[in-house]
Amino acid sequence: MPSKLNPSTLTAQALGWVDPNTRALVPPIHPSVPYERAPDGSYPGGRTYTRDQNPTYDQAEALITQLEGGAAARLFSSGMAAAATVFDTLSVGDHVIAPEEMYWTIRRWLHDLASRGKIALDLVANGDLDALRSALRPGTTKLVWIETPANPTCAITDI
């Protein structure tokens, strides 16, 4: 549920979090990678690996969720990790529309996926709404990827 507090108040108070053990007002940083494993190999604490389940992220994700009024938020170690997560939701044959000017690594990756038949891909000129409309394939277009400002040109797409 979105907070009624001003975003400045929310960020200054970090959701009013207080460490129950130390009474610290700022969440601790957890640099550890491994978590305890039980004799049967399970993870009794529920976390398996810090790269994707770091408790350091919990408060920041909760705060961003409140600030954006969303259902949830996720932090990633890089933009490419975030992009890969989005593209991983696609099924074989799904259609993707992406801008002609975009981060080169994502562009190369999308071309690779398309060349192997994993996705159908159309690139359109950044900000060209008519080209975007023309590229839409009802029933198969599952993702329209917009990068603004575009890397490396800083072209702006009005979203």
Predicted regions and their residues:
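Buried hydrophobic positions in well-ordered alpha/beta secondary-structure cores of metabolic enzymes
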Residues: 23, 64, 82, 96, ...
